Amino acid sequence: MADQGVIVITVGGGGIPVVRKNGRLEGVQAVIDKDLASALTAIQIGADEFYILTDVPKIYINFRKPNEQALDTITVEEAKRYLAEGHFTEGSMAPKVRAALMFVEHTGKPCIITEAGRLGDESCGTRIVR
């Protein structure tokens, strides 16, 4: 689709989680994580790459500290280590990195986390690879 000039954006949030009980759908208390749902969609459709768009050009370790470091390309193992070390905050970059890991581990294909306005700028973004 991208070759035809189409970029598909799905799973934008706002869904209501439900379960089927006695033939009826009932709402339940839950959170639909749009990053993980997007990763699952990308896996299921056989995407060649998975882009997660955010408000920063790359992901960082030591974010907003004197030793802040932008990451260009990291492996699955490095991403897992940075998550375990607490470099990515919940409600912000941590769910995005987990979604990237899910996609890369299931497909072996890269995930790019980048700023929405810089999509297509190959100098931007963090690539997560095997």
Language model regions located:
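C-terminal catalytic "cap/lid" subdomain
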Residues: 1-130
